[in-house]
Amino acid sequence: MTHHIYNIYKQAAIALTLLLSATAIKAQTPTRWNNESADTTRITSLLTQVASQGNLTANQRISTFAHLLEDTPYVAGTLEQTPEILTVNLDGMDCTTFVETVTALAMTLEEHRSAWQDFVYNLGQIRYRQGRADGYASRLHYVSDWIVDNTHRGLLTEVTDRLPGWSHQVKTLDYMSRHRSAYPALADDESFEKIKSVEVGFRSHRYPMLKSTLMQTKKGEALIKEGDILAFTTKTDGLDVSHIGIATIHPDGRPHLIHASSTAGKVIDDPLPLAEYLRKNHSITGVRVIRLGNLR
């Protein structure tokens, strides 16, 4: 009887600790909402829905969340507001905010948490350098920077160079500073100089890739798993990655892409197999594969 009462008190204490933790997280994370009431309700619903499916892998969770967000309208520039604080918008996404959102949702369940405040915290963790929003340049704009920073902190792992047939590309990442007028935030001299400082770390940056030609073969297709984060390398000078999405394997065994498509105007499970998608997009040079968690 005494042991039973002790367990009840212990469980209550754990629940209280988690509640206080979530409350503290909310207080510590300045957040800009598109629709706070609707978004927090939907985040809670998404987390509860996927948590109820049991012991899924991280990749399965990412895939499930990605499918649940299909038909979300494509909206560019949702983060381009001042001051730079964490922005949450489930009503409209571009390719980057879509991937960040599903990754943060899956990350929250991987931590055995299910509160919307925990999702908000995790979204900030993966979007910003060292998890802290501190001006425009603290956002991880270049996907290579996003991968390096999140890998260093054990949140993501790039597995591209562990897959058979991988190659590499060497590029100097300076697209943003060379196209300053395309980024309104860079009209501010301090932000511009900070972005240039970030780019200094990516001069002659070497990164792994699976060549587009390889990924158009059955051998290449077989390398992709359900829920992989796929980043598409580009021919564009000064830029590493031009698009990003989530892999899903169709019943015929072929990988497709769930992504926020500007062409379709919404998040879609692309009807084209990945190989055909690559064949049609001549500016894509290859694919990088990233997975959630520290997989070293």
Task: Describe every region a protein language model picked out.
Residues 2-13:
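Bacterial N-terminal signal peptides that target proteins for export
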Residues 25-27:
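Boundary at the C-terminal end of the N-terminal hydrophobic targeting segment
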Residues 29-100:
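Cationic-aromatic interfacial patches
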Residues 69-204, 253, 259-262:
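Acidic/His-rich structured neighborhood in mature extracellular/periplasmic domains
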Residues 223-224:
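Short, well-ordered loop/turn sites that connect or cap secondary structure elements
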Residues 230-294:
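C-terminal soluble interaction/assembly domains
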